[in-house]
Amino acid sequence: MKRILLIVILFLTAMAVFSQDMTSYKDEFMRTDGTFDERLLLLEAVRDAGLTGIGEFYHDALKYFIVRAPDIRTTTDRNAAEKSAVILCQGLGAEKYTDAAGEIWQIVELFDVAGDATDGNAMQAALIALGQVNAQDFVPHIAQRLSNFNTQSITNPETRRRVQMAVVGSINALEALHDIRGYRPVFFVSVGSYDPSIRQIASTALPNIVDDPGDVSIEIIRDTSSIPSVKLTAWNEMLRTRAPDTSKARVAAAALEMGWTYNTTNEGYRKNLSDMRKGAIDAIRQFGISDDSVYANLELSYSRNFVNNTPDYDEIVKTLNTLTAINTPESVAILYKFLQELNGRRRNGPWANKERQLFEWVVSCLRRTGTQSPDVRILLTTISRTDTYTSQERIMARDALNTLSGTR
């Protein structure tokens, strides 16, 4: 029987190469007495013939395949059916046959890797095909499936293998569909407990899903359930995008804010938050101020380090340079406030190496702003004439004042 069928298939293949008439194939595939093995042989012949423009055939065949799915009873039937589903989905994907999206999704459900008897190939092929046929209506379904995988804790190696096949299919689909709703679940694959190769696939896909995932990035950074390492990764991923500067500035503001509002005693997490703050401060210098809340958080990056016994001088320098580069009345006012505080310390103490270093940096920053603020000029004049300062410190203040006055 199989030999006769194969001869018929080869004959039909030769006909189809020249005519592209798939009627005979369709009739043979839909024989009511056909087996899953026989249908698989026919599909393999179609695939190997390299025919094109046959999306309608694949679609009709898939519809019939779904109708006959309840007939799957044995392991042999299931293996042949899964291989057939792969060929059908790959064919529809290659043809970009959008009308078949609904049936392709049924294959996702029919061969869900949650079933122990399913290998994972068919589900992966179906998910990939959904991206290829531009199945926009199914973005929420794919994103939800991927989110569900992200929340699972899987210890069985075989189950893990099958799930990761479906995860790769989901990533591929969401990358192809370019919808922001796919960004969050793919991001959480990149920071999840999957194999490194799977996480890398997700990370590589992220910049291709949407140009500007700013809103989603802010949600992840502000999410109280996201640990600092995840927040830091979300921030760094935002920097890799093609988002406009205004969007990156908004996310930078959120990253800086969360870097100060998230409380933890975990040293690793505190390092994550510090790195996120410093990256955000650099970005604000580059992309600008998105809202006035940034000023208060920049001030925190200076003041909290100022009172710390082990200050992060790198964060202080980045903050001062950013305030100088922004050069708005608000940023100059903050620099002026810093100098006022240092002036108070010079009079009343303590005044040690830390204060001397900060004094030098703040005076230099005010000089570089070119500000014409009367308050700044008066304070610099006072410092230049106060004996409690060293001659070097008074000279620094005088030089800054002369620069602002345009005399040097």
Residue ranges and their predicted role:
Residues 4-13:
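Sec-dependent N-terminal signal peptides
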